[in-house]
Structures are given as C-alpha cells and as structure tokens.
Design a protein with these regions (language model features):
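Beta-rich carbohydrate-recognition and catalytic domains
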Residues: 1-150, 154-199, 208-261, 283-333, ...
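Beta-rich accessory regions
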Residues: 211-214, 239-465
Length: 465
C-alpha cells in the first residue's frame, strides 16, 4: 500500500486528491469558463480499489476546488474510465426545463466476473450530481475482455455522436444520434499495433499541423502496459485521418511513437468542448502506484499540456507544451553551476549544445538530465527513496528499466528545453515539446542545488501559486 514518506511530497501546482487514491483522468470537459476534472478514485483507501468518479473544477487548471464524488458503483459494476458529452441540443432528451445535459459515458466493470460494458449517466446541475440511465448498458459487451474507456465526441462528418474505446489489442468506433443507441462503425489496430499488449484509455483528436497544405491531422492516443521486455507503461499515438466511421494511420513508422519518454504519465486524454487539444495524464506509473511513499493520498495529474503537430524529417510528430502556467512563472534569471534552490517549485530554461543538469540535495541524492546533439537522458537511479520498487513483482519489469530512460531527438544540434520541478514531480519539454518526459522522484530531503556542466546556458524561474 502507499506508504507514509519521510516528508510531504504533495506538489504545489499539480492536481492531487485531497486524500486517498486517484488514477485516470475522466470526463474532461470545458464549459462556461470552468474546467471539469473527473477521475478514477477510491474514496476509502490510498490504494486501488472499487472505482468511483471523483470530481474537481478549476478556472485555470492550477487551482482546484474539490467536489463530492460524482459516480458510485452500482449493480452493473464499478465506475471505470470514460468521458463527457456536453449535449447542448438535448439530443439525449434528458433535459426537462431547457437545461443542457452533461452526459457521462463510462465503463461499468463487474469486479467478480470482469465483464465490462458501456453505460451513461446525466447531470442537469453543471456536473455535480448524476442520474444513471435506466437503459444501461448502452453498449453491451460483445464477448471480449478489456472492453473499456469510451471517449465520446461530436462527429461533424456524420452529424452524430461518435466514440472510440479500447477492445483488447485494438480500438473500436461507435456512432449514435442520442447517446443511448449505438452502432459499431469500425475498428483500428489489428495488424498495425507494434506493441503486443492490451490497449486502454483511447482518445481521438483533431490537431493542427502548422502546414498550410495539410491543415490538420487526426491523432489516436492509446495507453498500454507492456511488462517483460521493457516493463513500461506508455502512451502510444498514431497520426492519420478519420473518415467519420473509423481511423486510418497515414504515418507508417518502424517504431512506436510515444507521447512521453519518462516513466510517470499514463492514461492521458484531452478536454472536450475546447478549441484546442489540452491534455492531462495520470502522473504515476500503474506498475508501482500502489506503493509510492506519499502517505494520505496517492496519485496526481501532469500539468495541462497543449498538443500540436510538427513536421520533421521523419514525418509528423506530436509536440506538447505546458498550458495555462504562463502567469505563474516569475521572471527568469541566469544561473551558474551549483545554484542554491530556495523553493521546491521552479522551472529551468535551457539552451545549448550538450551538457548535464542535476538537481541535488545534501544527502547525495540527485536526478540528472543529460543532453547530447542527438539524445536526451533522464536518470533517477540516485534520486531518493526507491523502496516502492521492492513491492512490485519482478516478473513485471526490470528495476533498471524504470530508473534511466533515453530518447532520440527529432531536431539535432542545439537544444531548447524547459524543465519544471514541483516537489516530487519532474517534467521535461525539449525541442519545442517534441521530446517530453514525466518523472516522479522522492528525495529524502528537498533538492537544494542545481548543478550544471557542459555547453549549456541555464536560466531559472520560480513558480508562484
């Protein structure tokens, strides 16, 4: 179970539950200036258990107001992941007096049999309270395990609602006029999935390319745990087109494309009803999330990130950048080697050719980022408390695979990089966000020094909340 750490590891600007467990972000929706975050939640313990939907709201994605649990388990199952439809035109017929229903589309998971089916619930009071639809499930299980995590969206091509969900090792697409009656329209993934494992937490988004001829592409996002060979929990993405019925991959690659080369970004999805794709991910690796030393709570979310596409020599690749934190960055100033730290929430702006950056404390603990002309490496092998690895089945992963990670750079030569550190969570955005890493660390004492060497110019800014 989650252990009481040697100190408080709760971040300052990343979402965490008030107490107990959270994992996947769910039902992300932006309505009338309010960002709604629903999330997988066990309100009774700091470890994974019967899933509910927790709920929080924000005006800036940094400051959050916690609200009561939104969805509770029922006779069909516990409340697994899903998404939210803002039914402005009342296609569902749930509105009674002119309201605009918020309709949660989620997976009900039977804890005894493992059966997973898709259900809906609606709210007429801005997402505070939900009524389960009497006709649930709206998509019955077709006889397959791992049938979950629907992502609903309005389909302009067909003038209907569509959703994508994970079904074993592939994605399936469904369409509906009223959010109640669904028809399967297509599949994607059989034969193209380069990682042989179960898919989950699918998302389908339309993203600008920056190319006046292409305009935009569609990106299919898929989370997956693949123990054994690499022992990682990653988020793969595919670049392609959506014809209104199904997805086709147009960027054929020899290797999988990953959203993040770190260890602690999983089940990430984007906000609905917003004019740009804004992403949140679960900021802990599911392989060891039950054992991290955070005490009264377990789990956090990444910083919000805006997604876009960049055309590289190898084709279109996803870029991510922090979203909504500009006003919380204090002025940046140059720093030299061995710069003392006066805060546990800060950012580093890095330019140069090659070198090494380390965050260190007086106990000899450090987390290291190393940059070369063609790669970036993050190393947390000496970052602090690593005892949470001891509780995980070694058959699932090799410890060394979750301590050091290297990615190639899509833009060789001088690097531009932003590093954001928040008490126990490190985020790296390099080359405009073409290479991104998310890493949990649990130092026994706060990091006190930034150490640099090599051909790098580093500026530091503090983060005010």
């Amino acid at each position: 179970m989650s252990k009481q750490g040697k100190r408080d590891f709760r971040p300052n600007i990343h979402f965490t539950p008030e107490k107990n467990w959270n994992n996947d972000p769910n039902g992300l929706i932006y309505i009338d200036g309010i960002w709604h975050l629903y999330y997988q939640h066990n309100p009774n313990d700091v470890v994974w258990g019967p899933m509910h939907w927790g709920h929080a709201i924000s005006k800036d994605l940094i400051h959050w107001k916690h609200l009561p649990v939104a969805l509770y388990p029922d006779e069909i199952g516990t409340m697994y992941s899903g998404s939210m439809a803002y039914d402005e035109n009342n296609t569902s017929g749930f509105a009674k007096y002119g309201e605009k229903p918020m309709v949660a589309v989620y997976t009900a998971h039977n804890m005894e049999t493992g059966l997973e089916q898709q259900c809906i619930a609606y709210s007429l009071d801005q997402g505070k309270h939900f009524e389960k639809y009497y006709g649930n499930p709206v998509i019955k299980n077709p006889g397959t395990p791992d049938f979950r995590d629907p992502r609903v969206f309005w389909n302009d091509k067909k003038d209907c609602w569509s959703l994508v969900l994970a079904s074993g090792d592939h994605a399936e697409f469904y369409a509906s006029q009223d959010l109640k009656n669904w028809k399967k329209t297509g599949e994607f993934g059989v034969g193209v999935n380069k990682v042989p494992t179960v898919w989950e937490c699918t998302d389908l988004i339309r993203v600008k390319t920056g190319n006046e001829f292409d305009g935009f592409k569609w990106i299919l996002i898929v989370s997956m745990i693949h123990p054994g060979t690499e022992g990682r929990a990653n988020i793969q993405y595919f670049v392609g087109d959506f014809d209104g019925d199904t997805f086709q991959c147009t960027e054929i690659t020899n290797e999988p494309l990953w959203i993040d080369f770190g260890f602690d970004n999983y089940a990430g999805v984007t906000y609905g009803n917003y004019d740009r794709p804004v992403y949140l991910g679960w900021g802990v690796n599911p392989l060891y999330a039950n054992f991290v030393p955070t005490g009264e709570y377990s789990g956090l979310m990444t910083l919000p990130r805006e997604l876009s596409l960049c055309e590289t020599e190898e084709g279109y690749r996803l870029k991510t950048k922090p979203f909504g934190i500009d006003e919380y960055r204090a002025g940046a100033f140059p720093i030299g080697n061995q710069k003392p730290l006066l805060t546990e929430s800060f950012g580093l702006l890095v330019q140069g050719n090659f070198g090494r950056i380390a965050l260190k404390n007086s106990r000899g603990e450090e987390v290291v980022i190393e940059v070369t002309v063609d790669s970036i490496t993050v190393d947390r092998s000496k970052s602090g408390d690593l005892s949470y690895f001891d509780d995980v089945d070694p058959k699932l992963f090799k410890k060394e695979d979750l301590l050091v990670s290297t990615t190639k750079r899509y833009m060789r030569g001088n690097v531009n990089m932003e590093i954001i550190f928040d008490v126990s969570y490190l985020e790296i955005y390099a080359d405009g966000g073409l290479e991104t890493a998310s890493v949990c660390v649990y130092p026994d004492a706060p990091y006190q020094v930034v150490s640099t060497d090599g051909d790098l110019e580093v500026k530091m800014y503090t983060i005010k909340k």
